[in-house]
Amino acid sequence: MNIVYLTTEAVPFAKTGGLADVCGTLPKVVAAQGHRCAVIMPAFSSIERSLQPIETTDISFAVPMSDQKLIGCRLLKSHLPKDPNDPEDSAEVPVYFIDQPQYFRRPSLYGDANGDYHDNAERFIFYCRAAIIAMTRLGYPVDLVHCNDWQSALVPALLRAASDNVAKTQPIATMLSIHNMAYQGNFGFDAFPWTGLSWDHFRPESFEYYNQLNFLKTGVVTSDVVSTVSPTYALEIQTPEYGCGLDSILQGIPQPVAGIINGIDTNIWNPETDPHLKRNYSVVDWADAKIDNKLALQAEVGLPQDPDVPLLGLIGRLADQKGWDLILPVLKQHLAEARPTQWVVLGSGDPKIEEQLRELTEQHPEQLAAYIGFSDALAHRIEASSDMFIMPSHYEPCGLNQLYSLRYGTPCVVTKTGGLADTIVDATPENVAANLATGFHLNDSSAGALDHAINRALQLRYHSPEKWKNLVEFGMSQDWTWRKSADQYIQLYARTISLNRRRRSGS
C-alpha cells in the first residue's frame, strides 16, 4: 500500500503532545512491513531545531485562497530519523514540509500567550489544500491518506469534491484519526471561501455545522473510516459526556469508529538499557533493582531514604482533566495525617495547582517532592523507582505514562476511562487469582475512590507480596510495542481502501 500521513506534528520536527509521537513512529513501523509511506506537514519554525538534514526540493506551487489572494509555497524534504541501535528501524520514510513562512514560520504551532492565532482557519485550510497539490506534484500513487486531528480533517471532503483534481485521477481512500475530541477546529462560516469551493458544498453532510465551519466534523462525515486511539475512547466519544457535541454524528457514520491503542518506543523506554537509571533490570531481576533506584531517587529529590515506605509517582500536566481535583485532597489528607507514604510529582500546568504543590512541599519535605517543569531523565527515574503510579484522569483518549509504568514494573492506579480502561486490568480478587491484573481502577471519579484504590494497592503490596510480584511481572510482560499497533493499522488501512473502492463503484 502507498500511504501518506497528514499531520501538524511528528517528532523530532514539531511537538506539543502525543500526536507527534504517533506520527513520528507509526509511519516507520508500517513502512518496515513493506508499505510505502510518506509524511506531509507544515514547515513550522521548529523543524530547524530538529537536527535532521532538510533539503529544498524543486517543487513549488501556489494555492488560490481567493480571487485576489494567491499564496505560494515550496516543498522541503527530510526523513524520519532511524534508530541506529534498532535493526528493525531501517525503513526510509520521507517527510515533506509545506514551506509558507507567512503561515507557518511562527514561534509556536497554534497560538501564543494571547490564545489561538487569529488566522488558524486560513492557515490550516491552506495546509489541507497544499497537501493535496503536493501529493499530485510528488508524482507517485497514493492509496490512502491518513489524516490526524482537525488540522488536516478537511482533506477527505476536499478530495471528494476533487477541488484540486488529484481525486479525479487517483481513487484515494481516507482515514481520520481523532487524538482528542476536545479540539475540533470550529470557525465562522466566513472562512469557507478559502476552501476554493462553491457555497453549494457548504452543507450539513460535509462542511457546515450549525452555520459554522467545523474541521473535525467535516472529516468525520466525509472520510471513509474514523479511528481513535483506544477502543474505549472510540465508544466514549459517541456519548454526550465525551463527544463534545459530535456524539450523534459519530453514531450516524456508516462505519463504526475504530480504536487502536498507541504503541511506545521500547528502545527509549526499556528498563534493561535505560541510561537514566542507577540500576537496570528486567522482568526476572526487578525487585532489588527497583529498591536501589528508589533509594537513589529519594536522595535525588530530597526525600528520606527508606526502602520500605511506599513511593507514589505522578508525571504530567497539572490540570483538573488529569485528575488533580481528586489528587490534591487525597495528597493533603496523607500529608496532614502523616500517613506512611511518599509522593514525587513532575509536571507543570495550572498555576494554582503549581503553587499549592510548592507550598505543600515546603510544609512536608519529608513526604512530598514536587518538581514544576519537565525533565525527561527524571521522568524515567520516577517510572522506574515508584512503587505505584497515580493517573486518575477524567478522560484519557489513550495515555502513555501507564504503558511506561507497566514496562518498568510500576502498577498504576487509574480511572476506568479511555485508554486507561483498555490497558490496565483491575486487581479484583478474580483477576489477581487468575494472574491477569496489572493495576487498580477507581470505582468512580472522586477523591474518596482514589484514596480507596491507593489503599487497595498498598494492601496488596505489603500484605500479599507474592500476588504483588505476579501483578508486576504480568504488567512487565505486556506487548505495547508500535509493531502491535502498526499491524492493527495495516489491517484497517486495507479495509479502508476496500470500502473506498466499493463506495466509488456504488456497490
Curated annotation (Swiss-Prot):
Binding site for ADP-alpha-D-glucose: K15
Reported function: Synthesizes alpha-1,4-glucan chains using ADP-glucose.
Top-rank lineage group of the source organism: Bacteria
Recorded GO MF terms: alpha-1,4-glucan glucosyltransferase (ADP-glucose donor) activity; alpha-1,4-glucan glucosyltransferase (UDP-glucose donor) activity
EC identifiers of the protein: 2.4.1.21
Family: Belongs to the glycosyltransferase 1 family. Bacterial/plant glycogen synthase subfamily.
Protein source organism: Rhodopirellula baltica (strain DSM 10527 / NCIMB 13988 / SH1)
Name this polypeptide is given: Glycogen synthase
Gene Ontology biological-process entries: glycogen biosynthetic process
Reaction(s) catalysed by this chain's protein: [(1->4)-alpha-D-glucosyl](n) + ADP-alpha-D-glucose = [(1->4)-alpha-D-glucosyl](n+1) + ADP + H(+)
